[in-house]
């Protein structure tokens, strides 16, 4: 992931957090301001939790060039946290656990609840089902990739305690991505996804409903799973495949059917 790619994604997340924070914690006197003047946010009072998907021991999928998904999740989560702190959100926490799923997922949601967080963002990168993958050679090693789909996705759970807030933030993030010329991936709606099909609840923002995501379902604050992608195709795409055959059943919040992420 290049610095430019990371910066673009981080800026969009920060923008969405700012917008949500302004709605949740308007500055003193903002309620008496003229209607045309946007509310500002008490950033020091707003706590965002940036959740790193997967663990060192269960690193998720493998990219088209042999890099574990966890490495990308950690890199992006670090950048998001740093940018939020730099923007004045001093209470931002990057959440990492070593416990294997599903117990680790439950622990992460419980930690966010204990912190009384205002927002929960889970960072993941995606791939397609295994049967859609092709093989190619990179640096004398064989890896798998897929050119079939591209785009980002935002997941929310209707079982989250703040369903309306989750949808609000998901829409803010998705629309910010679209404003930068990115498109959401439609492949989650297709029959080829089988039992991994998801309901598209906001086509304008690329927001999908996935009620079973543990870290979204068990948190008590607005929560979404951000699955960023760059609009690229070909073997330069960072396309993911699942490492474990049982991952879809053992890790309901980390499905095997993912898209793809960063190109090299």
Summary of predicted features, one role per range:
Residues 2-264:
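Catalytic-site microenvironment of enzymes
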């Amino acid at each position: 992931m290049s610095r430019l790619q990371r910066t673009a994604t981080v800026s969009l997340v920060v923008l969405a957090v700012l917008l949500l924070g302004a709605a949740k914690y308007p500055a003193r006197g903002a309620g008496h301001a003229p209607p045309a003047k946007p509310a500002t946010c008490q950033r020091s009072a707003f706590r965002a939790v940036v959740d790193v998907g997967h663990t060192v021991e269960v690193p998720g999928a493998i990219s088209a060039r042999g890099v574990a998904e966890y490495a990308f999740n950690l890199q992006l989560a670090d950048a998001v946290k740093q940018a939020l702190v730099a923007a004045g959100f001093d209470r931002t926490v990057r959440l990492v656990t070593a416990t294997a799923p599903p117990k680790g997922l439950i622990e992460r949601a419980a930690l966010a609840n204990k912190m009384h967080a205002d927002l929960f963002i889970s960072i993941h990168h995606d791939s397609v089902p295994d049967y859609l993958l092709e093989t190619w050679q990179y640096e004398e090693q064989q890896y798998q990739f897929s050119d079939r789909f591209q785009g980002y996705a935002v997941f929310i759970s209707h079982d989250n305690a703040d369903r309306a807030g989750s949808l609000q933030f998901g829409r803010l993030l998705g629309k910010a991505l679209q404003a930068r010329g990115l498109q959401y991936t439609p492949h989650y709606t297709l029959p080829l996804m089988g039992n991994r099909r998801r309901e598209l609840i906001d086509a304008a923002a690329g927001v999908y409903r996935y009620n079973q995501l543990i870290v979204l379902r068990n948190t008590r604050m607005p929560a979404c799973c951000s699955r960023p992608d760059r609009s690229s195709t070909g073997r330069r795409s960072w396309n993911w495949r699942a490492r474990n055959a049982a991952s879809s059943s053992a890790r309901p919040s980390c499905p095997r059917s993912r898209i793809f992420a960063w190109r090299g």
